[in-house]
Amino acid sequence: MANTLDVANNLEQALRESDEFKSLKEAYEAVMGEPTAKQMFENFRDTQLSLQEKQMQGIEITEEEVEKARQVVETVQQHEGISKLMEEEQRLNNLINEISQIITKPLEDLYGTAEQN
């Protein structure tokens, strides 16, 4: 077990040292260093978190909330720095998803996939 946790800690360090994480951190710091971009990004994140909380609690999201979220997304996508930040976040998420597929391979091999059953 300790060896597995050591490998996980090494993976965490490798993620921090990856080009994907470094690019994300650089883009994040650029946005946080610009007051207007920072405010726009924080508004975007607050809107996102609010909708996620409602979904998790089973609360219906109104058309007005959907429209507001759409407008917020549209606005932040027009900001070059925030758009870059979102692209870099997606690149890191892609890497993490690939790692997740590798990590869960033993379970997939054990239980098989839905297509095999």
Swiss-Prot record:
It holds the Pfam family Com_YlbF. Transmembrane segments: none annotated. SUPFAM superfamilies: YheA/YmcA-like. Belongs to the UPF0342 family. This is UPF0342 protein OB1136. It comes from Oceanobacillus iheyensis (strain DSM 14371 / CIP 107618 / JCM 11309 / KCTC 3954 / HTE831). The lineage of its organism: Bacteria, Bacillati, Bacillota, Bacilli, Bacillales.
